[in-house]
Curated annotation (Swiss-Prot):
Highest taxon of source: Viruses
Protein name: Gene 16 protein
Length: 166
């Protein structure tokens, strides 16, 4: 990453505030106008390094740092132009958390249009008439009327508002 510094060198002397380009927007203009320095920063995710080095389990940061600095000094540093300053190495841990997709399971279907009804029953039976054989009767649809007290729960007469005849 290229490194930026504040233009106001009286408030922030050169080198006291150095901000990588990747985090420049997060400062929110706190340091005022910025200029591009001749410095750069190499950021390496430590978990990727461990994977390429074949390390599994616990990561020993000091061993990884030594190894990467040795390789950097051997291969990269000789290729850097003289005006580029190498101040050291920045390691960071990259973590990606994947959420499971929402899974919706249908547990119950209910019909809110229906109201429960209850009927009064009698403990004794009585004969109200005698059935006799007669000619067939033709019934017209829609002639049945059931009179019941509507309730909005399974317990009858427990609440005036829930069990009213309104």
């Amino acid at each position: 990453d290229p490194i930026y510094a504040p233009v106001d060198l009286e408030r922030h002397p050169y080198g006291t505030v150095l901000i990588p380009e990747s985090t420049l927007e997060t400062t929110g203009g706190t340091f005022g106008e910025m200029f591009l320095t001749s410095r750069g920063m190499i950021s390496i995710p430590i978990n990727d390094l461990a994977r390429t080095m074949g390390i599994t389990g616990t990561i020993d940061q000091s061993a990884i740092t030594e190894e990467i600095l040795r390789k950097f000094n051997q291969f990269v540093k000789p290729l850097l132009p003289l005006h580029i300053v190498f101040d050291g190495l920045t390691l960071y841990l990259s973590v990606v958390v994947n959420e499971h997709a929402d899974m919706i399971t249908l547990n119950e279907i209910s019909d809110t249009e229906k109201a429960y009804c209850w009927f009064e029953t009698s403990d004794t039976t009585s004969l109200t008439g005698v059935t006799s054989i007669s000619a067939p009767i033709t019934a017209t649809p829609g002639g049945t009327i059931v009179k019941a007290t509507p309730t909005f729960d399974r317990t009858r007469a427990d609440d005036l508002l829930l069990d009213s005849d309104a």
